[in-house]
Regions:
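Carbohydrate-associated surface elements
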Residues: 150, 168-172
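Nucleotide-sugar-dependent
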Residues: 12-16, 204, 247, 251-252, ...
């Protein structure tokens, strides 16, 4: 059984695709080295590798500073420094012929080129479409995993069986059961009236603020909730919550009436996104209202969609009247289970050379 190195552009708490892939590889029996986003050694002292979850060991690479990447000489030196740290920790952990799995990040290509030069098996994960430097990354990688079908088929036409589809990763079955069984609302929701339309994440500029404003203005008794800094709506029925740790997301969902995903379909990246939060909603059977992003086209019976404010208002009205014990809620939960980390681990075991 080969081990794995996951290079992420976040921290472990983000619980994004790299973190879920780390959990999947650990389920297969691999020991995993998880590499968080590098930080400046002038800001933080180096910390030892620590065990994040059973079989998953994390560290944060140290560099001089991200600003130095604007010059090719110092950028190349910092890339080698990161590769050195990854290789050193892999050796200290006695990882067995580890596979390196990584998504797109700024300045990650030279790091991965250095690791490839040292003989590591490289697996690139295409998380967005369009993807910056896509051709350079797939040319470097031994294998490519693709989350969106928009990118999948052109890459398979080009590279054949080096490219594999990666279904979006829902939480583990045990975590889904925990989410579904949560009945206590998060205290931050106490001041927010119902019905609550919840975007269970940080928008990062990916939602259509104009659409949201028109909906909230037309329906002042509906309340939009998201996590992270204020979004500029400045409406009494728009609410921004401070950071919510992963173990409290269930409390947010317990107080949610509609899972709300008003992505901006005018932007190609957002039109092609594959939102992880969808499966958090599905895990508890919540009705979901969204703009019609491509990822949802295969599940029209599970999600309410609309392009315009009027269509989305009707979609929310339908979602709010959906029976709580109806069969559609059970089907959502079943789809979340199909996408569980356990099931994706089985897929990875088939497509990655983990047995030697």
């Amino acid at each position: 059984m080969r081990d794995a190195i996951i290079i992420a552009g976040w921290t472990w708490e983000a619980f994004n695709i790299p973190e879920r892939l780390a959990l999947s590889m650990a389920l297969l029996g691999s020991r995993v080295l998880y590499c968080a986003n590098p930080v400046s050694s002038f800001k933080e002292k180096e910390c030892p590798v620590k065990e994040l979850e059973p079989g998953i060991f994390g560290f944060t690479p140290r560099i001089w500073g991200h600003r130095l990447n604007q010059w090719s000489f110092t950028a190349a030196m910092q890339s080698r420094t990161i590769a050195d740290q990854i290789a050193r920790h892999a050796e200290q952990l006695k990882l067995r012929d580890p596979i390196v799995i990584y998504p797109y990040m700024a300045r990650i290509l030279p790091v991965c080129a250095e690791l490839r030069r040292r003989g590591f098996h490289m697996v690139y994960v295409v998380m967005d479409h369009p993807q910056t430097n896509l051709q350079a990354h797939v040319a470097l990688a031994d294998q490519t995993l693709v989350v969106q079908r928009t990118s999948l088929h052109p890459l398979r036409a080009q590279l054949g069986d080096k490219v594999h589809f990666l279904p979006e990763l829902a939480p583990s079955l045990s975590y889904q059961a925990e989410l579904s069984g949560q009945t206590v609302e998060h205290p931050a929701l106490a001041r927010i009236p119902r019905p609550r339309l919840v975007y269970a994440g940080v928008p990062h500029g990916r939602v259509h603020v104009g659409l949201i404003r028109e909906i909230l203005t037309a329906r002042p008794k509906w309340h939009y909730v998201h996590i992270g800094p204020p979004d500029g709506l400045e409406l009494p029925n728009s609410h921004a919550l401070s950071w919510i740790p992963k173990n409290m997301i269930g409390q947010i969902l317990a107080g949610t009436d509609v899972g709300f995903m008003p992505y901006d379909c005018r932007i190609e990246r957002d039109f092609n996104c594959a939102p992880l939060k969808l499966f958090d909603y599905f895990a508890v059977g919540l009705p979901v209202v969204s703009t019609p992003i491509i990822y949802l086209w295969e599940m029209p019976d599970l999600v309410y969609t609309g392009d315009t404010p009027a269509e989305l208002i009707r979609a929310v009205e339908s979602a709010l009247t959906e029976p709580r014990d109806g069969p559609v809620r059970a089907r959502r939960k079943e789809m979340a289970r199909e996408h569980s980390i356990e099931n994706i681990a089985e897929l990875l075991g088939r497509v990655l050379p983990i047995n030697g």
